[in-house]
Amino acid sequence: MISPAKINLGLEIPFKRLDGFHEIRSVFLKISWGDDIEIEPASNGVFELFSNNEIILEKRKLYDQVSERGDIKNNILYKTFIKARSLFPELPGVKIHLTKRISPAGGLGGGSTNAASLLNFLFSWCPFFTSDEMFVLAAEIGSDVPFFLGEGHAFVTGKGEILEEIEVHHGQGILALTPQVMNTSEMYSLLKKPLQESASQKNGNTLSKNLISILKNGDWSSLQGRLWNDFEPVAFQLHPELGVLKDKFLEFGSSYCSLTGSGSSMYGLVQGLEIQEELLQRLRQEFSNLTFVRFNF
């Protein structure tokens, strides 16, 4: 089954919370591209991972360092299994076959989506493991993990644990798998957001009616200027070539283009399959050193 990547339609970071996390506001979309993962119970009760690394060459070693070929104790799947088993010793062991395409440090939720796939599997095997307990556990593992437990798209606030499912029109896009490594903690620190109590937040916890309508109707060009990613100025200052890439996405026919997460991956949404194919070919011709993939949602 697919362990899908996510993209962010807009990512606002209004302030840093007193608990050390940053408050976020973003629309999270699951896309059709991602990792392939197969999980089965292991009779010996242990954790086994067998992975095939298909991440772009420049970032391939980042995954291998935490795979079964490196230090497995730093792998999010292993951490998820150990944490779940500590709460529910009755859980079975697992044997996981993973084709890894989503790179670390890409803003696509590659670790979080795998963790959610494993939690959903364990939940199906453990009748006394309630959905509320799974959600709490997911939030402890990673801020993006709760989103991947669901099936749909969501407006996400808090540190990532407050989810409001939303309706989004079917659409297509192109994803650029870029080689730049963006350390999430470093990117947040570079934003230099003011410290503030979460309780003092008075607005911004809901999408405007205008944005809800745009998302339902799939008018992606109307998102430009209405949804933005606060990490883009920092990312483009560190890596000006990413700003050039965004300009070309828009020049070549993308209706809306943005960095996803804290970077470094970038995507463009298009109006229809014909424009999607034309955009893909022009980007591949302009940036022959980069990897581009089609996706839909």
Swiss-Prot record:
Transmembrane segments: none
Keywords: ATP-binding, Isoprene biosynthesis, Kinase, Nucleotide-binding, Transferase
Enzyme class of the recorded protein, top EC level: transferase
Gene Ontology terms, MF aspect: 4-(cytidine 5'-diphospho)-2-C-methyl-D-erythritol kinase activity; ATP binding
Domain of life: Bacteria
InterPro entries found in the cross-reference section: GHMP_kinase_C_dom (IPR013750), GHMP_kinase_C_sf (IPR036554), GHMP_kinase_N_dom (IPR006204), IspE (IPR004424), Ribosomal_Su5_D2-typ_SF (IPR020568), Ribsml_uS5_D2-typ_fold_subgr (IPR014721)
Pfam families given in the database record: GHMP_kinases_C, GHMP_kinases_N
Pathway membership: Isoprenoid biosynthesis; isopentenyl diphosphate biosynthesis via DXP pathway; isopentenyl diphosphate from 1-deoxy-D-xylulose 5-phosphate: step 3/6
Function as written in the Swiss-Prot or TrEMBL entry: Catalyzes the phosphorylation of the position 2 hydroxy group of 4-diphosphocytidyl-2C-methyl-D-erythritol.
Family statement drawn from the similarity comment of this UniProt entry: Belongs to the GHMP kinase family. IspE subfamily.
Protein's name in the database: 4-diphosphocytidyl-2-C-methyl-D-erythritol kinase
Record organism: Leptospira interrogans serogroup Icterohaemorrhagiae serovar copenhageni (strain Fiocruz L1-130)
Organismal lineage: Bacteria, Pseudomonadati, Spirochaetota, Spirochaetia, Leptospirales
Gene: ispE
